[in-house]
Amino acid sequence: MGYSPFNRTVFGAVALCCALAGQASAFTACQVTDTGGIDDNSFNQTAWKGVEDAQKDFGIEGRFLESQAETDYDANINSLIEGDCDIIITVGFLLGDATEKAAKANPDQPFSIVDFAYDPPLSNVLGQVYATDQAAFLAGYLAAGMTQSKIVGTFGGINIPPVTIFMDGFAKGVDHWNAEKGDSVVVLGWDPAAREGLFTNNFDNLDDGRAFAQNLYDEGADIVLPVAGPVGLGSATLADELGIDKLKIIGVDADLYFTDTERQHVYLTSVTKRMDATVHQVIERTMNGEFEGGLLVGTLENGGVDLAPFHDMDALVPDELKAELSAIRAGIIDGSIAVSN
């Protein structure tokens, strides 16, 4: 059986940082983060882990530039273009325009972008996208089965597709529970039909994460899914103070039980997307002379997205609910349970 890109274990001027593994190499992988920083315990960090894994596996050089604001995107990308990068990886939907402009101006430079797909595709850009609604559907069903108040909540960082896809899947998972059980669990914070909901309009203010979770808790939610990168750490702090009997958090992107160890006990689970694995695969393809524009898509079936283990809360999740989640996972994979419209 061949190498599976998703069977590996791991957001967004300017300070240039370099990391080397082993001896200096002729191959250099470069990355531009979105706001939030390289060590955000979530989006940027997970993508950077893919570079770190490639350093360990292949002995390449890795560099990154951190974007402190959206105004840094163009300058950061252009700086790396001048830095002899064999592949430039940009992290996040918001870097889509800047990446496209740079790619068109530098057609011989390979690029890859996390969470963006170009239509029509660009010949020198490989997009990395994820069917996170599939895993979030499982999280919504789980939350509906675990809530005591019959109210769950979610909020996003910015109203963009890579954020709302989590919220869509979560809401549909709750709807599926209600339909199967004749129940009436309510989702606060997102209306999939109206495309309206709660958004902090940033990915880095932990105080907003606390405040938004507090508002949802005050309205009765006892499980909250923050889809806002490091902002969600503020929600976890609130859950830590209130106690998990009153508020549980569902993480996103990485398994926050491992990346947010100080508050790991508040996470019921996490909706993970394996950016580390796709970044690693892009680097390997490029090293092997196999780079071409197009898309890599992470799904439940190939392990590109998933629902993390319940860890410390495993004993709280009924065996019947676990069995139902396994059956739903199989149904999503074989197409008998529809998630996307």
Stretches found by the model and what they are:
Residues 18-19, 31:
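Secreted/luminal cysteine- and crosslink-motif detector
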Residues 26-341:
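A residue-level marker of the well-folded mature domains of exported/periplasmic proteins
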Residues 20-26:
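Sec/Tat signal peptide C-region and signal peptidase I cleavage site
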Residues 12-14, 24:
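Cleavable N-terminal signal peptides
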Residues 1, 15-16, 28:
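Secreted/extracellular small peptides and ectodomain modules produced from precursors
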Residues 2-12:
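Bacterial N-terminal signal peptides that target proteins for export
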